From Swiss-Prot:
UniProt cross-references to SMART domains, sorted A to Z: PA2c
Taxon lineage: Eukaryota, Metazoa, Chordata, Craniata, Vertebrata
Name of the gene: Pla2g2c
Keyword Signal applies: yes
Protein name: Group IIC secretory phospholipase A2
Glycan attachment points: 92
């Protein structure tokens, strides 16, 4: 019974950190662009969402490619940007990144900076967002197999 309790606490903590990072990015996208990250950007083009590859289809997709590259660089430094939680504030449309207490603080702050650049890029390219590039279940056959290097 004690083993199950320890396991459940571990799963809760891992899930909370994963979801918190996920939700932080979602909230940032919503505040800055006015759009839902999931319904507007997940599955957009060749790089928005999981498993990016090919040539970005437009400026919005290039935002996602740059975000992937930013996260990739953090991983090279030993960070886990999807898991490293962070704090942010938005005042007059300006995002300010901070970090939560505990391990991964610097990595969390750097992940926030990646997310911040991405949402500003999304906002800058709202006028050229093309709904036909958004797929609910992205298979991305038009993207090819090769991944664009950072």
């Amino acid at each position: 019974m004690k083993g199950i309790a320890v396991f459940l606490v571990f799963i809760f903590c891992w899930t909370t950190s994963t979801l918190s990072s996920f939700w932080q990015f979602q909230r940032m996208v919503k505040h800055i662009t006015g759009r839902s990250a999931f319904f507007s950007y997940y599955g957009y083009g060749c790089y928005c969402g999981l498993g990016g590859r090919g040539i970005p289809v437009d400026a919005t997709d290039r935002c996602c490619w740059a975000h992937d590259c930013c996260y990739h660089k953090l991983k090279e430094y030993g960070c886990q940007p999807i898991l490293n939680a962070y704090q942010f504030a938005i005042v007059n449309g300006t995002v300010t990144c901070g970090c939560t207490m505990g391990g991964g603080c610097l990595c969390g702050q750097k992940a926030c900076e990646c997310d911040k650049l991405s949402v500003y890029c999304f906002k800058e390219n709202l006028a050229t967002y093309e709904k036909t590039f958004k797929q609910l279940f992205p298979t991305r056959p038009q993207c090819g197999r090769d991944k664009l290097h950072c």
